Amino acid sequence: MLNYFVYPYGIENDIGIKFYMILVPIISIVLIIINYIITNKSDNNINKTGPYECGFDSFRQSRTTYSIKFILIAILFLPFDLELTSILPYTLSIYNLNIYGLFILLYFLLPLIIGFIIEINLKAIYITKIFNRNVKSITSYVKYNNKI
């Protein structure tokens, strides 16, 4: 009687699931071993560490520096993007969930809203402008930098 409540669909007698649970790790391990045997183990090729430039040698250094703020914004974007995809099922079933679903949604959104407020207060998503504030257009920029 207890087995019916623990395994209501008769999983303990299903040979397909047991076969799957054994076969998948075996195939994964075999593929990893084959990959290890076939691959070239020498890392002496200097081109592997350089950037790939569509098959031609670059005329200048291709690894230019850029601000870490862009990476930070991309990392901060991820939780809020996942938040949006997690809210979508709620919008489809809002009629069935009633007030209980609303409390679950608020419990889910509250830490994200607090985190967003903290990010704004710490100015984690603030990007400084690189150009001079006195420059109004491209022509004045060229005149300003004496490139006429």
From Swiss-Prot:
Record family assignment: Belongs to the complex I subunit 3 family.
Record function comment: Core subunit of the mitochondrial membrane respiratory chain NADH dehydrogenase (Complex I) that is believed to belong to the minimal assembly required for catalysis. Complex I functions in the transfer of electrons from NADH to the respiratory chain. The immediate electron acceptor for the enzyme is believed to be ubiquinone.
Record's bilayer topology term: Multi-pass membrane protein
One GO cellular component term noted in the UniProt record for this chain: mitochondrial membrane
Pfam family, one: Oxidored_q4
EC number(s) on file: 7.1.1.2
Name under which the protein is recorded: NADH-ubiquinone oxidoreductase chain 3
GO MF assignments: NADH dehydrogenase (ubiquinone) activity
Keywords of the record: Electron transport, Membrane, Mitochondrion, NAD, Respiratory chain, Translocase, Transmembrane, Transmembrane helix, Transport, Ubiquinone
Transmembrane segments: 19-39, 70-90, 99-119
Disulfide bonds, paired cysteine numbers: none
Gene name for this UniProt entry: ND3
Domain of life: Eukaryota
Catalytic activity: a ubiquinone + NADH + 5 H(+)(in) = a ubiquinol + NAD(+) + 4 H(+)(out)
Localisation per UniProt entry: Mitochondrion membrane
